[in-house]
């Protein structure tokens, strides 16, 4: 029950339109398992559609930026999916929607933008991607969806930038994953994935078993898992509430902004980005400094 309540809270935080008493989602050992569950769902949906149309389904691909978290490489390796990555540069430090769509075709199971890139701290422009993707899908007749990897940003954007549209308010965002043990403020390991509606979670991903006299239905790659992290997440939600989380995240952002500003004043360093979107940023040695 506590797990279901956590999923409901997170789904509402991400503006889920689902009207069910229990929102559609699952927990994982970390955001890595949550990413995999979102990816598997996208792959199974694509495969079912291709089978129904009598088309080949042996060459699926996935599109995302070169700043991907390593779990996506593992996911593609395990499920034999081609990974197509859009290079990032200083001129294009986040996923460019047009470049991403140029890599898509009828075999693309989904596009994966990132909210809170782990090695830059930036967010991909998911609203712009959704807009471009909508036009692309209408033109081609495809139904390529978006899975948002919000391992970091999933617990930052709702509190600090609620006006930014990156979540289920967007048409093609069908699933989102996040980490409970990053800005969710729980000890490792805990991850969450939520789908926009139950219809986006393939039935074959639900596994039912009679265990110790009780019927258990779960969606996950692991079976045995500790419950302590779920208790921790639920406790934090109830204890801190929205305002409490907002205060914690704002404090983290204030500290990051101070460090970003001070490092930016040092002649020997350059900040990778002038803007700060998450309590995370990187800097590098000024190439002119040694000269």
Describe the residue ranges of each PLM region.
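Short, conserved charged micro-motifs
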Residues: 288-291
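Short Gly/Ser/Thr- and Asp/Glu-enriched loop/turn motifs at secondary-structure junctions
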Residues: 20-22, 57, 273-280
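Conserved N-terminal alpha-helix of the aminotransferase class I/II PLP-enzyme fold
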Residues: 1-33, 45, 49
